[in-house]
């Protein structure tokens, strides 16, 4: 099965927070992820605290063949620039 890196929404109404997860491509939206690689909180006022990504695990999943969604790829690029 193909593994992808994508966002999984968590949080309250009107206060979105996302997990960056490694998950099977055909899995349902709320299903259990193989691994949580990071977190993204767009509501956080501090830009430095919006993205928390375990770069080592992200690189591992990409190396193994997981394909990142365009949004996750952009967030990873932004996180590595810090």
From Swiss-Prot:
Source organism's superkingdom?
Bacteria
What are its GO cellular component terms? cytoplasm; small ribosomal subunit
The protein's matches in Pfam families, at most eight in alphabetical order, are given as: Ribosomal_S16 (PF00886)
InterPro entries (alphabetical): Ribosomal_bS16, Ribosomal_bS16_dom_sf
One annotated GO biological process = translation
GO molecular function term, any single one: structural constituent of ribosome
Keywords, sorted A to Z: Ribonucleoprotein, Ribosomal protein
Checking HAMAP family in the record gives: Ribosomal_bS16 (MF_00385)
Q: Which family does it belong to?
A: Belongs to the bacterial ribosomal protein bS16 family.
The protein, known as: Small ribosomal subunit protein bS16
Name the species this protein comes from. Elusimicrobium minutum (strain Pei191)
